[in-house]
Amino acid sequence: MIKIKKGLDLPIAGAPVQTIQDGPAIHHVALLGEEYVGMRPSMLVQEGDQVKKGQALFEDKKNPGVLFTAPASGKISAINRGERRVLQSVVIEVEGDEQIPFEHYAAEELNQLSDEQVQHHLLTSGLWTALRTRPFSKTPVPGSRPRAIFISAMDTQPLAADPQVIIATESEAFNHGLTVLTRLTDGKVHVCHAAGQAVTRHTNTQVTYNEFSGPHPAGLVGTHIHFLEPVSQTKMVWHVGYQDVIAIGKLFTRGELCTDRIVALAGPQVNQPILLRTRLGASLSELTAGKLKEGDNRIISGSVLSGTAFSATHGYLGRFHQQVSVIREGREKELFGWVMPGRDKYSITRTTLGYFFKRKLFAFSTDMHGGERAMVPIGNYERVMPLDILATHLLRDLLAGDTDSAQALGCLELDEEDLALCTFVCPGKYEYGPVLRDILTQIEQEG
C-alpha cells in the first residue's frame, strides 16, 4: 500500500449520498471537441443529418482511423465552432434508440483476441478515444503499445462518487474490460483502489491491484503513475476511466456501444446530492433541472478543482468527467471583508478564523477573495504536492516559459488536474493548468 501524506481534502458541503438513481430524460447530448488535446476533426456529418448511436461523426486528421462516434441516435442539431474554426461541440437532438451493431465474442474468447482485433474494434466503435496517453494526455496513435495501462478505481476529488459502488453494479463487464485491455500491452494493467476496499480480483496475473490511501490527490491517475510507472519522453503509459472499462467489456461481449454514465450531482447548491444514471455528453441544464437551489449558480462538468464551467457551447457532460458540481457565483461585494475574522471562509493558512474549524464544511462559491498578484512562495504548494517534485521551482518555470527546466523538474508526468490544488492554494491566484498545457504542447512540438 502507498500512503499519501501531503494533499488536501477540500471541506466542501454537499457531498452526495452514495445511492444510484435514474436521472431525468435527456433530449440533447454533445461531443466536446476541445476535450481531445491536439485533435483536428475531419467532419463526416453536417447539421440536420440523422445519425445512429455508434455512427462516426468525425475523424482525427492527425490520427487517421481514430473515429469519434455518436453517443445517441437522433438529429445533428448544431456544430459549434470557435475562433479559427476550432470545433467546440457537436450537438445531437436525441430521437429513438437506433444503434450500430458491432461484433461480439464469448467471454472465454477474449483472452485469445489479437492486438489488431482489439484495436480495430475500439477504433470503429469510438471507444478508442476513452484511452489517453501520459505524457501529453492525448488519444493514442493506432498501432502503438504502452508500457502499462492504468485504471483508477478510486476517486478523491471533492464531492466525487465512490467508484466501488458503481463498479459493483457491473463487476462482470468490468472484468471483461480488463481482459480486453491486457491484449493492448505487454506490461501490467494497474487497477488502483482505495486502501481497505474489498475488490474482486481478476484471474489474469497481468492485472495488478495497488492500494493508495491519503488525501486528494491520492486518487488521481497522475499520482498512481508517478509512484508505479514514472513516464518520460521515451516511456509512455495509457490510462482509462473505470466506467469506460465497463463500456469496453460490454462492447466486446454484447456488441453494443454503452454510453451510460453514472455521475455524482453534488455541491452546496444542490438540493439532494446523489448519484444519477444518465448518458455520456448529457445536457447539464436538462440533467440539473429542478434539482438546484435558487440563486445565481455555476454548474461545472467535473470537479470544482479542475472541471469545465457551463456555457452555451460547453453545457454538456464531459467525456472524462464522473461528476457534476454546483456552487454559488460569488458576485457580491463584502464591505471591509479584509478586516473580518472570516469564520465562514476556508484557508489552509492562519489568515481566517475558518482555518481553526477542522471539521466544518464550507459552502464554497466562485469568489477568489482577491485579484492576481505576484507569485509568493510561502510553502502552500509543498503542502498539497505529494509527488517527488520541487513544486515551487516547477511552477515558477512554467510561468516563465522555461521548457527545459520544467521538463527536468518533471512536468511530463503531469496533467492539468495534477496542478489543480496548487491553483487553489496559490496566493497569487494563478491558473497553472492552462500554463502547463501550453508548455507540454511546446515540448511536444519541439521534440
Curated annotation (Swiss-Prot):
It catalyses: a ubiquinone + n Na(+)(in) + NADH + H(+) = a ubiquinol + n Na(+)(out) + NAD(+). Coiled coil: none annotated. Its EC number is 7.2.1.1. Keywords: Ion transport, NAD, Sodium, Sodium transport, Translocase, Transport, Ubiquinone. The keyword Ion transport applies. It is an enzyme of class 7 (translocase). It comes from the Bacteria. One of its GO terms (molecular function) is oxidoreductase activity, acting on NAD(P)H, quinone or similar compound as acceptor. Belongs to the NqrA family. Composed of six subunits; NqrA, NqrB, NqrC, NqrD, NqrE and NqrF. This is Na(+)-translocating NADH-quinone reductase subunit A. The gene is nqrA.
